[in-house]
Amino acid sequence: MGKSFANFMCKKDFHPASKSNIKKVWMAEQKISYDKKKQEELMQQYLKEQESYDNRLLMGDERVKNGLNFMYEAPPGAKKEEAKEQEGETEYKFEWQKVAPREKYAKDDMNIRDQPFGIQVRNVRCIKCHKWGHVNTDRECPLFGLSGINASSVSSDGSGPSMHPSELIAEMRNSGFALKQNVLGRNLTANDPSQEFVASEGDDDPEVEFLKSLSTKQKQKLLRKLDRLEKKKKKKDRKKKKQQKKKGKSKHKKHKMSSSSSSSSETSGSSSDSETDSRDKAAQKKMYSKKRKKGKFSEASSSDSEGKAKTRKEKLYEDLSSSHGNKDKDREKYRLLKQDSSAENSKRSSCEGERKSKSRYQRETERKERDSRSQSADERRGRSPCTSHSSRRQRQTRKSPSQSPGEERHRKNETRSPSTDGHRKEKKYREGNGDRCSNVEYRERSRRSRSRSRERKKKR
């Protein structure tokens, strides 16, 4: 359960992923590679033979010229067998390898490690007996427990290798091992000046003799004095260090003060910059206010022009009084004065008309504001329906401010009713008294106004 289709198919003989088919493919690849190697070896052998023939021709050999050299040369396979016989038997690491059977691919290769059944294999070599399979500290070694001198005496019989320490060190270096220097020690030489004996001068020193002559108590006193002197020296050193620290701190403070002064100068510079900025802003504000004043007080400029015109008149009058003889000139000047006076009168009339219109408009706006305030007060106190109707009309008139004040007056006169007249009288009375009347008086007035309005309606 749960296995894939490939796992099912790889168990079939015809499937390429089966083990038998993979093995067949691998065997075929190995055969092809083996054939290629053989062909390469034969090709190299042929090339070597050709080179030897060419060399012999150059040397002037007559056999080669006649073409009979092949009769005096051995076949290609005979050379390998001769080489094996000359080399002799290969040295095996272990004794069991001499008779052990090996496969073809592992026969010539000694680096392959064998793992025979039931035999312990250790790829280690002993330093003393130079045999594979154990170490010099193992009991298997025949030279176990023997020192270097005893081992050398045993091996001097010719049964084994020499065990001299110098030879052992050399063999270890050749085999890739090395001993530590603490084991080897220093390579001492007799002529080395460091190995020479130096005559001791301690006996001749007067200080040593003096110390030897002192008793134990005197020695203790000396030690105490020396301790005191050392303590004094330490105190002096501490004081010097403290003074140096204080000097460093004072220098640091001075540096801080200088830096703070520089920073204050910078801040003063920045404050001066801010002052200049504020001055610029004030100047801009003044210019703006001047422009507004020019727009607002254009009437003042007109009054100034009138003053200038008066000065001109006075000058002309003086000229007239001075020149009595020239009548024609006097007439012309009089005409000019009349023209100036007429122009000034027209200007004054226009300015006064504008002022009157403005004052009327302002008065009307003030009246509207007062009416709105009184209406709000009436609503709070519970006013009559007639007053509410009049307030609606007044609101409608407020919503259309584009109309001129004359038209508004005409419309108000048309839409005026007796109830509104009484309401306006009440407003005037309240404005005159300064809104000091109480609620009781207000009710009485409203009753009177209502009665008056009824009488007027009856008369109509």
Swiss-Prot record:
Pfam families: Cir_N (PF10197). Residues 305-318, 325-338, 345-382, 406-434 have a biased composition (Basic and acidic residues). GO terms for cellular component: centrosome; nuclear speck; nucleus; protein-containing complex. GO terms for molecular function: histone deacetylase binding; protein kinase binding; protein-containing complex binding; transcription corepressor activity. GO terms for biological process: mRNA processing; negative regulation of DNA-templated transcription; negative regulation of transcription by RNA polymerase II; RNA splicing. Residues 213-460 are annotated as: Disordered. Residues 258-273 have a biased composition (Low complexity). Keywords: mRNA processing, mRNA splicing, Nucleus, Repressor, Transcription, Transcription regulation. The keyword Repressor applies. SMART domains: Cir_N. A motif (Nuclear localization signal) lies at residues 231-247, 288-296. The keyword Zinc does not apply. Residues 231-257, 445-460 have a biased composition (Basic residues). Its main location: nucleus. It comes from the Eukaryota. It is found in: Nucleus speckle. May modulate splice site selection during alternative splicing of pre-mRNAs. Regulates transcription and acts as a corepressor. Recruits repressors to the histone deacetylase complex (HDAC). This is Corepressor interacting with RBPJ 1. It comes from Gallus gallus. The gene is CIR1.
